[in-house]
Amino acid sequence: MRIILIGYGVVGQSLTDIFLQRKLENLRNYGFNPKVVAITDRGGAAINTKGLDLKRIQNVKKREGTVAADPVFGHLKKTGQEIIQSIEAEIMIEATSTNIITGEPGISNIKTAFNTGKHVVTTNKGPLALTFPTLTELAEHNKVLLRFSGTVGGGTPILEFAKKCLEGDKIKEIHGILNGTTNYILTEMTEKRVTFEKALKTAQKLGYAETDPVMDIEGLDAATKVVILGNWIMNKKITLKDVDILGIQDITLKTLENASKKGKRIKLIGSIDGNATVAPKEIERNDPLCVNGVLNAVTFVSEYAGRETIIGRGAGGIETASAILRDLLDIKHHLAEKILS
């Protein structure tokens, strides 16, 4: 299976770590032997149609800052678009940074992959948040697969749980803590009685929050995941503009104390229950959703099974890379079934 990897940051590098560490296990257990023929980052690309030496490329990236610095296989300034159009591969992995303003370059990368007959695995929430219905229709039109497990819950199989474990049931509502950064901040404020500003600084120091935390604290990151859940699980044709969003930036210690007096906690909850919303809400302390720290939790309310909750870490390079591996194996199984049918 030939793979093009677009984006070689923390997630992309974690994925090549997994490929190297579990090469024999993946081959023995799943018959999966990926051949990465191209990797791109902001400096350019590394290309070898016979398959790149991943350890070599990792060393070049660490030493020079870009895979394009490889003296044999490097190509300075080569763009993802050029690579997707010119290099033959079965799968394109889109792991560039999330852009919720235009969705680029992710949207163009994904569309180009579809139009050249490539299946797509993405961890980039931007294209899905802005154009989910369009992308799924385009994938179907081109008879290729689109997978995105890592966009919701990182390594926690939230999408798979709803799609497979609750298959045959009717999911009526979804409610969840979908952003670990805001959950950590609210936990710190509640348990240690520190201000929002101090909790945010601690989160940044520990690497839980970005230097510019707007996506997290204003609820935008959670909203992108609401869009993905709504489309994929509940077949709602929504995009980011359809979500009512309120972040946690105005939450005070007094607000949290008032909730505590009632035996409740305030959490940033993303919901799809007729409407699509993200907002701080009071929930009972014994509610399964009431998790602390950087944990995510999602409750699915279905017709037959009732309320089912899945909990796990929502972010991290290796966790998200493990979700990419799940998606790659899923595509491999689909292709094998197609050949046998």
Where do the language-model regions lie?
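Rossmann-fold NAD(P)-binding glycine/threonine-rich loop
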Residues: 98-116, 125-153, 159-163
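ATP-dependent carboxylate/acyl-activation modules
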Residues: 287-341
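Conserved anion/nucleotide-ligand pocket segment
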Residues: 164-224, 229
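Substrate-binding/catalytic subdomain of NAD(P)-dependent oxidoreductase enzymes
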Residues: 200-297
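Conserved active-site and cofactor/substrate-binding residues in soluble primary-metabolism enzymes
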Residues: 6, 10, 14, 34, ...
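N-terminal glycine-/serine-/threonine-rich beta1-alpha1-beta2 phosphate-ribose binding loop
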Residues: 1-112
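A short hydrophobic/small-residue beta-strand
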Residues: 120-121
